[in-house]
Every structure is written in C-alpha cells, then in structure tokens.
Regions:
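Pre-Walker A (Motif I) flank of P-loop NTPase domains
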Residues: 357-363
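Conserved glycine(s) of the Walker
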Residues: 370
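C-terminal accessory regions
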Residues: 613, 624-751
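Accessory, non-ATPase domains that flank or precede helicase/AAA+ motor cores in DNA-metabolism machines
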Residues: 2-328
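N-terminal pre-P-loop "Q-motif" helix
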Residues: 341-357
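Conserved helicase motor core of P-loop NTPases
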Residues: 474-620, 631-648, 751
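P-loop (Walker A) phosphate-binding loop of NTP-binding proteins
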Residues: 355, 366, 398
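Conserved helicase motor core of SF1/SF2 NTP-dependent helicases
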Residues: 362, 373, 377, 381, ...
C-alpha cells in the first residue's frame, strides 16, 4: 500500500496506513501503552522510508510485517513522524517471515522450534493450514488434535480481530474496542455494528454515545433519525441511573440531549422526539409516565427502575399487612440490663420495644448514638429470653467490610446481603419463589442499599420474617441508583426510631462529625487534625505534603500505610483518586524487578496493590466496593517443548478479597481500580484506623456536609483534613448535595 505524506493544502490530518516493520524500540512508557520506534517501510516511494513511529504500538516484535494506521505529523523538534493509532500484523510470504510471524504471535505453545517444524511441513501454506485444516497439523509428531484445534481458534480470532481493527479505524474509533466487540459479539461484531451502531453505547461497557454517534453519522445514518433519538434517550436514562437518579423530567432530557447533539436546536430535538415516540413507547426498556401529583411534568424512566420502585413499595406494604402478630412479651429491663451490663437510655428502650412489635422497623442515628448497643441487647433478648434459635437470626450488610464490622461488634455471625441471598451467576438462590428461612433479619449500613439490591432482598422475605434496618440517614446515599433508606424513612409508613444522644462525647472525631451536621466549623483535637492552605495553592505541592503524612502517621501513632485510607470527593484532577493512587502506590509499593502487569484500558497492577471492585460481578462473587490485594500477577508464558504437556498460562491477576482469591483476565481488569485512595462514596460502610482527606475548590460540586460527614465518620482513631481557604466553609453551608430523583417514598405512601 502506498504511503503518503500530508500536503499543506490539507486542513486536517488524514488517516493513513503504511506497511513496514519495526527495526528498533527507542522508548516505552512506564505503563507500556506508548512507544517510540524506528520503522523500515516497504514502500520505497514513501516520504521517509525509515520514519520514527510513535503511539500505541500493539505489536512490538522486531522485523515482523506490520500495517500501521495513523497520521503523518511534523514534530517541531524531531521532524516528520508517523503517529500510530493501531498496528495490525501482516501475513508474511517467505518461510523465514512465516516462522518469525508464528514464533512472535503469542499463540500458546507455539514458539520458535514448533514454528520451524510447521513451516518445514507446510511451507507457504502454513498459515492457511493452521486456520482451516487442524487435522493436518495434528499429524505432526508431538502435536495433539486438541492443541491443533486451539491453534485454529487462535489464528481465526486474530484474523477477525485485525479485520475489526481496520474497520473501526475507518471511523476514527479507538482500536482497543476491537477485542471487546469480538468477545461480546463474536464473528458477527462488524455486522452487528453496521446494523445499528448505536448498540455500542448501550450494550458495550465503556463506550459512550459520542463514539457510537460519530460512527453512525460517518456511515450515513440520519442526524435526526428515530434510531439516533431512541439510542440517545436510552443512553441518557442509563447515565442518569449511574448518577443515582431513577427518572428524568422532559426538560432534563432535552438539556442533556442538546449537549450531545452538535448543531441541533431544541426545536429540532422536540420534532425528532415526536417522530420517535412510537418507537420509544414500543421499546420494552424505556417508559414515559404521564404527569401526576408527584412529578407534574411527567417523566422518562427505564422500565426496570420504575418497576423496582413500584414493586418494592408493594412488597413492603404487603409484608406489613400479612405479617403474623408479634408476641406480646414485655421487655424485662432489669433482666436485660443485668445480662448485658448496659443501662439503656429511654430512646434505646423505645427502639428495642418497637422493633419487637413490628414486622419491619428502622433504627437511624449517627456514630456513638448506641445503634450497636441496641443490636446487642436485641439479640440477647431474642436468644436468651424468647428462645429464638440463633440459626434463625441473620445479620447482613451491603459490603464484606461492613459485615465484618457488624460481626465484630455483635458477636453474631454476619454476611453480605449477596451471600445471604446466595448469589449465582444468573440471579439469587433466595427469591420470591424460594424465600429466606430466617425468623429475623437485621441489615446494617442500609444507607448503602441501592434500589436493585433492596428489591432483590425484599423479594426473598417471607411474610413471617421480621426485618430491622439500621443505618445513618445523614450519610451519602448508595453508590447505585436510589435513596432507599431516606425514602423508606420519608414515607412515614415504617416505624422509625431516631437516636440523637451521643454516648461517645469524648471522641474528637464523633464530636466534630456532629458539628459538621449542624454546619458548625470543626475544632482541632488529638484525633482530628486539619490544615488550611491559601486559596489557589499549587495542588502538586499539596499532594506531595499528603504523601509525607503516611510515614508521619506511622511515626506518631504507629499506623502503617495499610491502616490508612485516603479519601477524596472525586476521581479526576490533581487531588482526585486517579492521580493520588499512582502517587501513593509509587511511594508504598514501588515497581520491583518484575514489570508492571498491564490490563484493560492500559491499567497497570503490581503484586501487593490495594484494589477495589467497581462493578458487581455475580459470576465471580465480588461486588462494587469490595477491597482486595493483588496476590499474584501471571505474565504470558510460552511453552515450546514438544514433550511438555503443561499448558501455558494466559495473563491473569489473582486478587485476595478476605478469604477468597479471585482470578481476572486482562480484559476483566476493567472491573478493578487501585484503592490506595478512593472516593468518599466508595468508602461507605467501611471504617479505617486513619482517614486522610483533601477537600479543595476543585471538587466544588462535592463540597457539602454529607461528603465531609461521611468521610469523617469513616475514621476510627485519626482523621486528617487538608483543605483550602473557603472550601470547608462552603461545605458546611451546603446542607446536602444534589437530591436524587426517586419515587419510592411516594409509592410507599400510596401502595
């Protein structure tokens, strides 16, 4: 293929492809995602037959025929270069080229010796035989039919992947998407996208509407066509759910649409929406709800979210009506206080007595208000005085960390809600058809419950089961959509017992947490330290200062970095979790002799890294917010001995979550993130010996009381706040963040 350089008349860089091979790798970035190399082109008429190529080189083997996709560019210092977007291996024609191609292909158990044997047997037909005639390959000594079949699959997939890469680049789409498309849609990936490119943004993880839209418009799809509007509406509602909302008003949808549709007016959107309404109404996953007393404008929602909110309200109200009467025992307080050694406050007594009377109850209160004391007293009364079998009492929490804390403070076995429901790859073992057998179920940290897990939980509750929810209504809402605890409390249909007395008044952390709730500036104590920087302080300097706190904390209090959690309001920015994670890791877990292990999206991992799961994975049994440590990083291994029957290992990462080790492929690590620093939202339900938090104007939208309160109450012994002039004051004046758009409270009140 002829290589061409750009002419001065060209107003924008044009995608080009050139054929050649790499002669020398000049530079590779630390994470292995960017390279500089010397190339030799096969086209003698190229503007430079030995150009420097820079960018994402997907293949780094030297002297292997490659096709480079990218753009010519003139660097002010280094001159003419080729900026690479993707590389695709080209099939060689000579025996030596085929041998080198096979030996560097990455195909399991196909190294240099085996490649020579194959080429000696099949010559220039070797690649075709590997792809189409595995039975001929299996006739060679030392190659089993099973291995030949695996090789056939490997090389057929390589062809498919390279075809997808080339096709995507026509539309200026990131070629890294090719592997995901092939994995999710198989050989039909290109046909699927051609039939409706908008499926990319609603069915493929990590692909936004802009990417799918760019491809669709390049393929000639109409700018205001029904397919575009339906896909946009679906995408916007899915994005709203990721931000916690269960519905959107027409005005919100229109504003969001205008941000994504270039060169389109509000009138255009309304006209296109009118034409698309039949298709929107016919879709099974989107729903328009007419105006009512709750949302006078009407609302758009995903059918699943609307169904869960309505269904959850019906189940809770039905449970209240159908539960058998509670035993009419009166609590013998002298006996219980003697048994537990606790003198209960009036509010605590009222809570225990109320919980015993009702089929469902809620206890809410901040740190130090006696929630744990009530739980211990309730469990003691049930087991010792009412002879309730301990096996019929289940304690659960949304995360493994919260469940472990619950077990430690109550002395009763606790588990995650997912384990309680016996999660499987395709659902839950306990559900509406097979309810949980327990008589009592107590769930702690219920502010973390999102709509989907609350829905799954209540579907598995039998009429005779008594349910107690415990949580702090002042904490941030769940990571997932909904505001379940707040909605249940606000509905007024469930008995709620609020605890307001602080029994830990000597704790500087607890005292200051309550000051934050009332909008009062915290005071410095032995347990709560903070430093205020001038407004506009250089964030790199702040980050450097934050890093010095890790050894200082160990020197002053004896807590190692494993016991310190850095919390930040947001992910991006100089003081966001992404930047902080890299900086903290390089300090506490620096790169060793082994190279970093590279996973999806160029993410890198090292043995010993603290990581968190960022999506629920029911098949693996790990869930959003779970924290683990990388225990083993397996790099690609090659086995080329004919007599060695071991199978080489694919790249994999082993992560220990508590007592469980979970294995991830490179592609699956898109579900993992470093967790040396994490968002305040992700830290819900956890408790750490030491918490360090930067709170700066960069995170203006997240400078509010719930964020500061939630972060502060995650600390058990020490909390350290780094802030900027005015930022804390703004947080204290902002009583709450953006209120989530949910309807569970309204449905509960009318169910």
């Amino acid at each position: 293929m002829k290589a061409t350089a750009p002419t001065p008349a060209e107003s924008a860089p044009q995608l080009a492809c050139i054929d050649g091979e790499l002669e020398n790798i000049l530079f590779s970035s630390d994470n292995g995602t960017w390279h500089v190399a010397q190339a030799q082109l096969f086209d003698a008429d190229a503007p430079n037959d030995r150009p420097i190529v820079v960018g994402a080189l997907m293949h780094l083997d030297l002297h292997v025929p490659l096709r480079f996709y990218g753009m010519w560019d003139t660097h002010p210092t280094y001159g003419l270069q080729f900026k690479v977007q993707a590389t695709v291996r080209q099939e060689p024609l000579t025996p030596a080229g085929i041998t080198r191609y096979l030996a560097t292909s990455g195909c399991p158990r196909l190294g240099a010796k085996t490649a020579e044997k194959l080429v000696a047997a099949f010559g220039s037909e070797t690649l075709g035989v590997l792809r189409e005639e595995p039975e001929r390959v299996a006739t060679l000594r030392g190659i089993s039919p099973a291995r030949a079949q695996r090789w056939q699959t490997f090389f057929q997939e390589q062809i498919a992947l390279e075809r997808i890469v080339g096709w995507l680049l026509q539309y200026d789409i990131d070629p890294s998407l090719a592997k995901r498309l092939h994995k999710e849609f198989g050989p039909q990936a290109i046909a699927m996208v051609q039939s409706n490119p908008y499926r990319l943004c609603t069915e493929t993880f990590g692909v936004g509407f802009k990417t799918a839209d760019r491809m669709a418009l390049s393929m000639g799809w109409p700018r205001l066509g029904t397919a575009r509007i339906v896909a946009l509406w679906r995408y916007l509602l899915q994005q709203a759910v990721t931000l916690g909302d269960c519905y959107q008003t027409p005005e919100q949808m229109e504003r969001a649409a205008l941000k994504l549709l270039d060169g389109v007016t509000a009138a255009d959107v309304r006209e296109a929406l009118e034409k698309a309404l039949p298709d929107l109404n016919a879709s099974r996953d989107l729903r328009w709800v007419e105006a009512d007393d709750v949302v006078p404008t009407g609302r758009w929602t995903l059918a699943a979210m609307d169904g869960m909110e309505r269904g959850l309200a019906r189940i809770i109200r039905r449970h209240q009506r159908e539960a058998p009467p509670a035993p009419s025992h009166t609590v013998d307080w002298a006996w219980l206080e003697g048994k537990t050694g606790v003198t209960y406050a009036d509010a605590q007594k009222a809570a225990i007595e109320g919980v015993l009377r009702h089929p469902m109850s809620v206890i809410t209160g901040g740190p130090g208000t006696g929630k744990t004391t009530i739980l211990r007293g309730l469990l003691t009364w049930l087991k010792d005085h009412e002879q309730v079998d301990a096996e019929t009492i289940a304690l659960a929490a949304p995360t493994a960390r919260a469940a472990k804390r619950m077990e430690e403070v109550t002395g009763h076995a606790a588990q995650t809600i997912h384990r309680l429901l016996e999660v499987t790859g395709d659902g839950f073992g306990y559900n509406s058809e097979a309810p949980l057998p327990e008589d009592w179920i107590v769930v702690d940290e219920t502010s973390m419950l999102d709509l989907s897990i609350a829905w799954a939980f209540w579907q598995a509750i039998a009429p005779e089961t008594r349910v107690l929810w415990v949580g702090d209504e002042n904490q941030l809402p769940s990571v997932g959509a909904g505001a379940v605890l707040k909605d249940v409390i606000a509905s007024g249909v469930v008995p709620v017992y609020r605890l307001g007395q602080n029994f830990r008044s000597t704790s500087g952390i607890v005292t200051n947490a309550y000051r934050v709730l009332t909008g009062t500036k915290p005071t410095r104590t032995e347990e709560f330290l903070w430093r205020e920087y001038p407004r506009g302080q250089d964030k790199d300097e702040v980050r450097a200062n934050l890093l010095t706190l890790l050894p200082w904390v160990q020197e002053r209090w004896g807590f190692t970095w494993h016991e310190v959690q850095v919390l930040a309001p947001m992910r991006r920015g100089a003081l966001g979790t992404e930047t902080l994670n890299q900086a903290i890791r390089d300090m506490v877990n620096p790169r060793g002799v082994e190279p970093d292990w590279t996973g999806a999206f160029g993410k890198t991992f090292r043995v010993g890294d603290r990581v968190t799961q960022i999506r629920n994975n029911y098949r693996k049994g790990v869930f959003n917010g779970d924290i683990g440590f990388v225990e083993r990083a397996e790099h690609p291994a090659d086995v080329d001995d004919e007599d060695d029957e071991r199978e080489p290992s694919d790249p994999s990462l082993d992560v220990r979550f508590g007592d469980t080790v979970v294995r991830y492929t490179a592609e699956e690590t898109r579900e993992l993130s470093l967790a040396y620093a994490t968002t305040v939202h992700k830290a819900q339900g956890a408790e750490y010996p030491v918490v360090i938090m930067p709170l700066f104007w960069d995170a203006y939208m997240l400078c509010n009381r719930p964020v500061l309160y939630t972060a502060l109450t995650r600390a058990r012994h020490v909390a350290i706040l780094l802030t900027e002039e005015g930022a804390m004051g703004h947080a204290l004046r902002t009583a709450e963040g953006q209120r989530r758009q949910t309807l569970l409270a309204a449905h509960l009140a009318t169910a």
